[in-house]
Amino acid sequence: MIQQERLLKVLKAPHVSEKATNNAEKSNTIVFKVALDANKVEIANAVEQLFEVKVDSVRTVVVKGKTKRHGARMGRRSDWKKAYVTLQEGQSLDFVEGAE
């Protein structure tokens, strides 16, 4: 079993975008920003234990950081990892519900 401390470090934040919102409505998929060293099993366990839902599948992608200019200097944003977590039928997780 994964330690509680590690579970809290795996999930960083929900990723809110137009694509993420459409996925949530159509295919019951939630998108999270996760730690770069997190694997699919850790992500699934973290979502199941923290939000008390059943996970069907997890897909991950590493988003490469963009090169940006700061005046005359060139800089680069950090790489980050995104996880698409598909919940089982009948399960739901709504972050926006309490904000209204």
From Swiss-Prot:
Keywords: Ribonucleoprotein, Ribosomal protein, RNA-binding, rRNA-binding. PROSITE patterns: RIBOSOMAL_L23. Signal peptide: none annotated. Transmembrane segments: none annotated. One of its GO terms (cellular component) is ribosome. Gene3D superfamilies: 3.30.70.330. Pfam families: Ribosomal_L23 (PF00276). Part of the 50S ribosomal subunit. Contacts protein L29, and trigger factor when it is bound to the ribosome. One of the early assembly proteins it binds 23S rRNA. One of the proteins that surrounds the polypeptide exit tunnel on the outside of the ribosome. Forms the main docking site for trigger factor binding to the ribosome. Belongs to the universal ribosomal protein uL23 family. This is Large ribosomal subunit protein uL23. It comes from Pasteurella multocida (strain Pm70). The gene is rplW.
